[in-house]
């Protein structure tokens, strides 16, 4: 970042962290407060030092709460250090801060981050503050461990050694004396710390819930929420009544209804928040777990947070494959060979189609040479023996809910996995499949057939699966196989499945898009890719801030199925890399297996050492808590879901998603876009103060927070202190200052703050404003830049943050001030001078208010664009004439157009002579990937979508991680993008893809790319992934979303293949009167017909992925004439059926305007849609319903005339273009922003 002297000055109203007065950029950059709170210009690196200096001055106001928490934090750290010998590290610091702030929250984090230690030390610290604690653990062994740890801590702390807390505890198997002491302590309520199992809590909830306490720590919340009974026990312990729960149920129902209607939900959050605050006023609740497979919506709403899951998609697994031998004994021998060389710590997964008998035979065969055990629901205790090293290798089923697949988290023990075949779903036609497969196949059938009954039943089945536990799903699947199923929805689902799978056409379509293989025995095989990810992921876990290295070896029993597995894995893992294992050479590609195993063993030994010594401090030192701020909630939700199912904190109206990235605990939240804008108060020149300094002008923009009223009007400044200036309501539903205050508190918790707003000038300005607002609270703030919302791009942005680009900020500042000055100046003239005169001329309308019209506006770019529309309409009117037309009966799709002339009228007959037909083949394309202007143009031309609507859709697709950044004028495609095209074509065409694949970068290097898909998924596959629930998006997609995605995908794929071959026929014609004596004049001397489009080298239907901007492909005219028994020359008599008015000049469409702005260089990717939207919204232009042509209104014509006659030189096309070029030079650091603003300032002073 540049020096302070080069930073553009600004004033932020109501933004001093301490007093809420105005504060300058300079003071915020120092990490300080306003000069009223502190006179000295001093830089601060942390908020603690800042608070101390303010307190010395006796001026501490709003920062008192943070001071209290920081003081308590120091006391807590002192206790922590004395107990453990080292201070808290990484996420523990954030947990402590949140606890001391009185926040209830969930800790969902992998082993080794000190969750239990934190809970125990918290109870001791709170005892020192006179507060009682209840700690709940899932098993008696964990209760005993907690008691032992707590006892040793108490002995190590001098100030409580003589007066220790009274600790009572319960677990099965206690001695009679211990039980008696615990009963007495619980009945008399004289304990300080109470520890019990979850089971005891449920059985004795009435007695325990009557006890007053201040801290509840629930370890292994997954167990605590295992049943509704245990969830109810926790709710009762927290003090929530059945009435509270009924209110929450009703509120959640309202929330769902409002969301579907797109109505406001803020008041619902307020109602829930009120209940929560009433019940938890004096309590802090912390849920802790390594995993979470279930949650309770009532409980999560009441406590104000939603636990997540550490089902981590961050993995460091070497994925290898080798062909599985055909014979069973040869397979067993191969596995033995692998085990001898890999050693202990292995998991062997057997696909479910091989049945339990296969597992028994495999166990028996291996037991002769290795210490192995097969795991089932009845032998799960053997996992403990494996964890302790008494068993070397475990064998289990490769099924999504298998014990080894989901119930194992042993990073110190598990080193590798072997899959004896591809995990799969296998069934025969007519067989009762398991519920997960049933749901997937119904989704496919619904997508293909559009049968409303199937769609309805499919959704009901999905809902059931989401609600049911793994055990319940297994039970229902067994009932279905045994013919004992009674559930009417599921029975209907199976009937529909069998009905459609017996239809060969449906079966064929399913096989085309549904990713399954039909085996020689007519079995349907579907790769179970989620099971592969989960099972292989057991070998690569997070422990104490590190992701362990793992090895996965897949014995491939079907290479077609392997191809489908890999395709599916690419959807959820950005860059999985398969290496073929050479067992004899003991290598896989460039990997020496011996070296890899050595590395894995070293890691496991280090983890075991950390675990046994209980000292994870060195490892935790590198674990950081990172706050990532983006603009939109959708983007925040999408990003957080890349790494696990995140836990959710609800703070006011803001959601904070928390997830784990190995050495980082990531908090992701959204600012809601811009948080500041220029004030509309009477300050300076339209919100910009101007000072003279050393004979130069200094421009100081004055910013205020952004507000929104209940009617969704956006503004910065109230009218009469509390009213929306547009509609005068006093109900304000949003003020960005509230969001800023939440972000400030989060910044105190974090070790690092990253701001990941959009990668353009607007995004940089949002990031800059947030940086300044947060700087006093955290000095470690940087910019995270990414051009696509994918796991890989986000990780790169987080791990390689950059400094803020002040030149981009300056450029945006110039754009905004120029827009404000010229806009406010000319708009006020239109509203107060032009309107009264224009209004009076509309004498027929007496209802109009002719004093002032606030809806009128003018702008630097807006006005030239309006001029184009008006001028084009004038030319259109001048060149209008009538055109007649008729169809050739024998060739219905050929229409003949005839200009108005003597002898041509409706119902008259003419003769069309076909003189010659020439057939030719032309190349089409490839066209480059979309830029903003070409996307807006095609979207308007193909679908009639407006520019603003297309930009909203593209923004959604970007934020949901489906396309790259959409505000771009670059065609460049990165190597990552090229690989997306290659992977897709390889999947669709197999080895033939090389016949058409021709990678192109379309430009030199740089950060920006053309608009492209982020994954090798066409629109049909996208619909299927969403319908199956395999791709869960933060927002529901509409048909228009799919349409826009489809053309983006096609245009991109076409940019990476050879040109299309387009077959055409050119028919030369002449027109005559009915008697064939008089020749008729016509502009139509030829008929051009496209008869085919192909890609040489493949025989696959190209319409699935190729960009073909041709709506109709017709049958050959020559062939049709031959069928009619005609030869060239030949003639047809036609009747003129109708006519219409046509001009030789076409009116503009929105697509045309975008291209015009691009070509004339007076627009930007970020402004095209806004400019067109403003012109339409002001009523200057109307858009025709059918043809989507833009027609100026009388108001638009008069506004254009008035502006050009009186202020033409300020809003001319040439002046606008030159000013935009200057702004680009500011962005590139080639022009001083002050000089550009000086020019604009001098200009507006000339406007009278």
UniProtKB/Swiss-Prot annotation:
One of its GO terms (molecular function) is ATP binding. GO terms for biological process: DNA topological change. Zn(2+) 1 binds at residues 16, 19, 34, 37. ATP binds at residues 92, 109-116. SMART domains: AAA, DEXDc, TOP1Ac, TOP1Bc, TOPRIM. A motif (DEAD box) lies at residues 219-222. Changing residue 965 to F: Loss of topoisomerase activity, still unwinds DNA in the absence of ATP. Its cofactor is Zn(2+); Mg(2+). Keywords: ATP-binding, Cytoplasm, DNA-binding, Isomerase, Magnesium, Metal-binding, Nucleotide-binding, Topoisomerase, Zinc, Zinc-finger. Residues 805-1248 form the Topo IA-type catalytic domain. A zinc finger (RG C-terminal-type) spans 706-735. Residues 625-789 form the Toprim domain. Introduction of positive supercoils requires the cooperation of both domains. The 2 domains can be expressed separately and will reconstitute the reverse gyrase activity, neither domain has the expected activity individually. The cooperative action between the helicase-like and the topoisomerase domains is specific; other helicases or topoisomerases cannot substitute. The helicase-like domain probably does not directly unwind DNA but acts more likely by driving ATP-dependent conformational changes within the whole enzyme, functioning more like a protein motor. PANTHER family: REVERSE GYRASE (PTHR43505:SF1). This is Reverse gyrase 1. It comes from Sulfolobus acidocaldarius (strain ATCC 33909 / DSM 639 / JCM 8929 / NBRC 15157 / NCIMB 11770). The gene is rgy1.
